[in-house]
Amino acid sequence: METLGVQTNSELREELNRLKEENARLKKELNQHQVIVNNTLDAIFICDNEMRIVQANEATERMLQVDSEDLKKRSVLDFLFSIPKDELNLSVKKFFKKGFLWKEVPIRLDCGATKYIEFLAKRGIGEDFFFVVMRDISSKKILEREFSMNEQLFKDLFDRAVDGIVLFDKDGGFIDANLSFCKSFEINHNELSHLSLYEFIDSGSRKDFDNIWKALNRKGKAKGELPVKLRSGVQKLFEFTITSNIISGFYMSIMRDITEKRSMELQLFKSEERFREIFENAMDAIIIWSNDGRIVKANQSACKIFELPMNLLLKRKLCDFLVDSQQKYSITKRKYAKYGEIREELLFQMGNGQFKELEFTSKRTILENQHLTILRNVSDRKRMEKELRESELKFRKVFNGSMDGNVLFDNQYRIIDANPLASHILGLSHEEIKQHSLLDIISAYEIENLASPARQINFDEMDNEIPFLLSSGDNRKLEFSFKRNIIQNMNLAIFKDVTERKELEERLRKSDTLHVVGELAAGIAHEIRNPMTALKGFIQLLKGSVEGDYALYFNVITSELKRIESIITEFLILAKPQAIMYEEKHVTQIMRDTIDLLNAQANLSNVQMQLDLIDDIPPIYCEPNQLKQVFINILKNAIEVMPDGGNIFVTIKALDQDHVLISLKDEGIGMTEDKLKRLGEPFYTTKERGTGLGLMVSYKIIEEHQGEIMVESEEGKGTVFHITLPVRQNAEERRNDE
């Protein structure tokens, strides 16, 4: 038993020693591994299953720029937040499922810097930790990106270059070309492999091309101009550079089509020739001068304008001829300095001392450090313009100050201009009248007849009249005459408003007629009244003394005598009105009394009279019996023009605060325009047995009341009398009338 125990202790000691040796060896190996891990360039660290960093080497600290103590507080996910969350979660799941993950990912450091790393994570079976190896591949990524960019840049340059780029072999066979080359050579890209550069070299240029090829083989590059002939027969000229052994021993050529350039150069040469011809033979003075103002070149016309020979002119400065005292000179100078071009007119003093007004245009930098000025003598034109302006001013004063309306119009009758009086006469503004045609005022027939050579109008005898309706609705009467072609395509129409004059003449004519009628009426009335009194007396005596049934005869005689008596009364009213007493009365009551008086006569003719009163009608200052006489005259006429019956509409309303309007409308046969104009004239009547005195008396009564009668009529539709009366009459005017 003791022996067994001793053996066991001995074995234990041996085992312990062995374990110590093994432990020392493992520590040694661990230290060696630790040294290797710490000195490796890759970041190596261990994480638990919560992704927290447990242990890391020094390379990890350097790569992540975090010390070891802080690293142990961090999760590896803290550095992977630049990866989209969904993608990161998917990668973590895949790692825990397979135990292995390799990925190239960007990481974001605490300082904000970004690095690209190669990330390797691996976990052992059944282990509750995993290790991660990270390698910084930022430089590699930068190189890859630069290479990719350079490759893409070359491809873009190759594909998008304006110049043609072609790769070909030592025999001239095409390998590849960009779109510009194919377009210039009029070939498709898929044809390139079957074509050679030699096929496009014209036989006359083969020797030159061989020399280019020799220079290329000798120097490794060549440049120059190469004429080619396309398959379509079109000839082009190309500017080229060729480099040998550019890619896999091939040649690369950059070719630019300069056919148009050469053509433009030729055109430019011809243009310069033409400019020289124009410069030397121009009627205007042309001067080229330098920045210091010195004249560099001038044509012969410049010598003539500046009154100097060429050799002296080329020794002068352009500013030497300008008159400094003129105000426009300094303004023109500043404008030219600012804009580099100008068009102006200035006063110049010529070489012989003469002053001339010159119109000029100047432009800077048409040539290097040079300026171009073209000058024209406008002294005569200026003088003519001044005379023309003075003439225009005189014409405008006469035109605008004329006592008649003047209108200028072209051969299509479009109004070009009108003076203020024409605008006033026609009731249109100056702008409005210019938008009209003369045909809007006068018919084409009248224009052609009045302005024809066979009938020249004397402006002092303007006896041609036309009616004209203003936009306000007023009717005017105009006298007019014309003058054709006062200048080319310009005619003159002269208007004079004679409305007031014609109305005055008409009033004078009627006044004279009324005066004569009044005197005649007074004489007739006095001469007839006395015999009439005797006749009435004897008829009454005779009626009482004669036996038999003669009542019908006496009634007829008495009725006719009463009619003669009413005519005598109207004569006396025309001759000299009796003393009139004006008083305030309601015109509505006067009208009602009149309608009541005439109702019996109206009923006999089957005529209905309707009175319509609108709003409150104020009383007016009037002589009621006279107004009643007016209403009787008009209503009786209305009844008589409707023998088959009809309606009379009477409307009374306040026109405004100071006037009352009475309208009497019938449904008779109406009147023509000519008849309307003569209403109120003595002895003018439209009735078979009328005297024409009733309406004349009515007009006179309304005139004495300071009112107005207006008549509207249309044949077949009836007539309307509009009577306007003032609420208060002007006492001064009434005294003058009396």
Curated annotation (Swiss-Prot):
Domain PAS residues, every copy: 29-99, 150-220, 271-342, 391-462
On induction, the UniProt comment says:
Expressed during growth and early stationary phase.
Q: Name one Pfam family in it.
A: PAS_8
What keywords is this UniProt entry annotated with? ATP-binding, Kinase, Nucleotide-binding, Phosphoprotein, Repeat, Sporulation, Transferase, Two-component regulatory system
* Molecular function terms from GO: ATP binding; phosphorelay sensor kinase activity
Q: What is its EC number?
A: 2.7.13.3
Q: Which SMART domains match?
A: HATPase_c, HisKA, PAS
Instruction: Report TM segments.
Output: none
| UniProt entry tagged with the keyword RNA-binding | no
Question: What is any one GO biological process for this UniProt entry?
Answer: sporulation resulting in formation of a cellular spore
Q: Name the catalysed reactions.
A: ATP + protein L-histidine = ADP + protein N-phospho-L-histidine
Leading EC class: transferase
Does NADP appear among the keywords?
no
Q: Where is the Histidine kinase domain?
A: 523-729
- Residue numbers of Phosphohistidine PTMs: H526
Its function? Phosphorylates the sporulation-regulatory protein spo0A under biofilm growth conditions. Also able to weakly phosphorylate spo0F.
Q: What is this protein called?
A: Sporulation kinase E
What organism, scientifically named, is this protein from?
Bacillus subtilis (strain 168)
**Gene encoding this chain?**
kinE
